[in-house]
Amino acid sequence: MTKVLLIPLLFVSTVCVAQLKGFGFGPYVEAAWPSGDFKQSNKNGFGAGIGADIRLGKAGVTGSVGYMYFGGKTVYTGNENTEMPSYNVIPVRVGIKYRLAPAIYAKLESGVARFTNDKESALIFSPGLGIRILGLDVQAKYELWKNDQTFSFLGLKAAINF
C-alpha cells in the first residue's frame, strides 16, 4: 500500500518542482539619487527588501516589498536654515519584464509607496533596464512617486535570486 501511494506522490512532486523552475526570489539592496525638486530637499537614499519573479518565456511578472530611507537636507530659506524632513518609505511594487537578450531585460513596475512618517501613500511608476547573470541581478532604473508632491530618483538595485 505504501508503494502505491509513494509512486504517485513522487510523480506529482517532480511535476511541481519542474513547474517552479521559472520562479525566483531573493533579497536586494538599492541606492537612490534624488532628481528634480526632491534633490533640493533630500539626500541620497538607500534601501533593502525582498523580490520575486516568475519567468514565462521571454516575459515575466515581478513583485517586491522593501524599505527606503532618504535623509533631509538643511536648506537656507531667506534669513534662516530650514531642516527638510527625512522620509522612511515602504514601497510595494508589481510589474512586468521582458528579456531583450539572453542576460538583458527591460522592466516596468508600478505600485504604492507608503510613507511611515505621516501615513501618506504615493503611486509608483518605475521603468528600468537590467542584467541578470546566474543569480546576480543588477538594474538601473528611474522611479517616480506621485501624490500631492512628486518624488523622483535614479536608482541602482542589486539582487541575489534563488
Where are each of the predicted segments found?
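Outer membrane beta-barrel transmembrane domains
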Residues: 101-129
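Outer-membrane beta-barrel "beta-signal"
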Residues: 24, 28, 105, 129-137, ...
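Cleavable N-terminal export/targeting peptides
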Residues: 1-24
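Flexible, solvent-exposed loop segments that connect beta-strands
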Residues: 31-42, 69-89, 116-120, 149
